[in-house]
Amino acid sequence: MRRFGFSGTALICLAGFAVLSLSGQDDKVVRGKYLVEEVARCQDCHTPKMDNGSFIKSQWMKGAAIGVTPAAPVQGWRPAAPDITPAGAVWKRWGDDGMTTFLETGKSPRGGKAGAPMPAYMLKRDDAEAIVAFLKSLQ
């Protein structure tokens, strides 16, 4: 019984340390989720929808047709929003740092701007990192 008590206590302590070490990252992911889904509403362009307008949850942030076209020509207009998950081509080209830089500066790692209708965000670094942490959690 004594052995089990010590082992159980050791496991609880180790689990507590694991939670403490992950809590900062978890907070960042939660904050990133809020920024992505409630503030910037990235899913409105980057997630495909069903005919009834609801999102296809299994395709969350995996890219979608924009669904609208401007009445007058808009330079750089993109008819589709790319997959912004780590599995997508953009992330594979840019990596974590490139995604963070894009959100901070509004420019790709090569200096290009996002095509319309994507706004050129210029976020604080901690906000950009939180968004990247959330998007990475979508793997």
Language model features with spans:
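Electron-transfer interface patches adjacent to heme c in soluble/periplasmic c-type cytochromes
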Residues: 40, 61-98, 119-128
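Bacterial N-terminal signal peptides
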Residues: 8-18
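Electrostatic cytochrome c docking/interface patches
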Residues: 19-38, 50-55
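Ligand-binding pocket scaffold of soluble enzyme catalytic domains
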Residues: 96, 110, 134-138
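Surface-exposed aromatic
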Residues: 113-119
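The canonical Cys-X-X-Cys-His
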Residues: 32, 39-49, 131, 135
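Glycine-rich, acidic and aromatic/proline-enriched surface loops and short helix-turn segments
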Residues: 105-109
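N-terminal secretory signal peptides that target proteins for export/translocation
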Residues: 1-4
